[in-house]
Each structure stands twice: as C-alpha cells, then as structure tokens.
UniProtKB/Swiss-Prot annotation:
Any Gene Ontology biological process: translation
Name of the protein: Small ribosomal subunit protein uS14
Purpose of the protein: Binds 16S rRNA, required for the assembly of 30S particles and may also be responsible for determining the conformation of the 16S rRNA at the A site.
Family as reported in the entry's similarity comment: Belongs to the universal ribosomal protein uS14 family. Zinc-binding uS14 subfamily.
Any one Gene Ontology molecular-function term assigned to this protein's record: rRNA binding
GO annotations of cellular component type: cytoplasm; small ribosomal subunit
Organism whose genome encodes this protein: Carboxydothermus hydrogenoformans (strain ATCC BAA-161 / DSM 6008 / Z-2901)
Binding site for Zn(2+): C24, C27, C40, C43
UniProt superkingdom: Bacteria
Gene it is expressed from: rpsZ
Keyword terms, alphabetized: Metal-binding, Ribonucleoprotein, Ribosomal protein, RNA-binding, rRNA-binding, Zinc
Quaternary structure annotation from Swiss-Prot or TrEMBL: Part of the 30S ribosomal subunit. Contacts proteins S3 and S10.
Cofactor binding summary note: Binds 1 zinc ion per subunit.
PROSITE patterns, per the entry: RIBOSOMAL_S14
Cofactor(s), names only, from the UniProt record: Zn(2+)
Length: 61
C-alpha cells in the first residue's frame, strides 16, 4: 500500500519545486530512473527489446 500512496504523492505538484523526485511513468519505481526516457531501467529494457522506443537499438561492437 505504501508504494501506491507514494506513486500518487509523486504525481501531485510539490509545494516547492526542489521537492520533486523522479519515478518511472510506467511502474512507479523510484530507483534506476533514466531522465531522457522518463522510465526505469527495467521498463526501458523491456520496451527497447519490443522495439517501442524509437531510435534505440542493441549495441554491438
């Protein structure tokens, strides 16, 4: 239940701008957040493998 309440709290506008913290837009995970995509590493990896993120492909060198 705490996770659901924290997700709801993160969606509200904060009283002060500096209090805003990043959460994944898909699952609500607070850690391993990628700013460029607005999601956590797990959701990013899943969507990248499915080809749903334009311009992202698996690196090989």
């Amino acid at each position: 239940m705490a996770k659901k309440s924290m997700i709801a709290k993160a969606q509200r506008p904060p009283k002060f701008k500096v209090r805003k913290y990043n959460r994944c837009k898909i699952c609500g995970r607070p850690r391993a957040y990628l700013r460029d995509f607005g999601m956590c590493r797990i959701c990013f990896r899943k969507l990248a493998h499915q080809g749903e993120i334009p311009g992202v492909k698996k690196a090989s060198w």
